[in-house]
Amino acid sequence: MKDKILEAVQISKTYGEGESAVQALKASDLTIWKGEFASIIGSSGSGKSTLLKILGGLLPPTTGNVLLDGQDIYAMNAEQLAQVRRQKIGFIFQDFRLFPEYTVRDNILIPFYLDHRTPDEQMLRKLTGILGIAEKLDARPSQISGGQQQRAAIARALIGKPRIVFADEPTGNLDTRTGEDTMKLLTECAAEFGQTLIVVTHNPEIAKKAQQIIRIEDGCIIKGL
């Protein structure tokens, strides 16, 4: 029997009030299972990123609850939620978000520095070996390719062994071949370490490889392509 890791109960999101109010996400339920790869797909402005941010603890819903390991993350205070994001959740963004003044190594290890934990050197070696950037750890982001920068961002998201990883258009700034290779490495790494992966993508070929496909149309959650 599969275990739930994330559950959204009647979540919705409305921006503004009165006549100017815009409903970005209509009341919906969603369940994500432990260890699965789920994709979120839909047209631009359909509500994909809004849903991802709500599920990841970055944007409170207007209504509803988000349960991570059975705990309502938006019932937590700011400090508790920040701790959950640092220890249980990993994020990968389209624009990499690497610090230019830091080495690749330090960029990857930022989750440990923020949480005052001792870096996991064994995990660092294993991840960077799988991702093919072990020889780039002393370089600055400007000294490596876009594909390598995104691999560093993937390593940063996974190295703290989060329960769940959210990726918002992780291949959006990469060419087709590099994007395919990067996505393959991301799914392989998440599977290797037993992490649940939720990816927002506009690419149906990437979406089709997921165990669960979540389609967003005009703020409504629809399962499947």
For every predicted segment, state its role:
Residues 4-215:
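ABC family nucleotide-binding domain
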Residues 213-225:
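H-loop (His-switch) and adjacent beta-strand-loop-beta switch element
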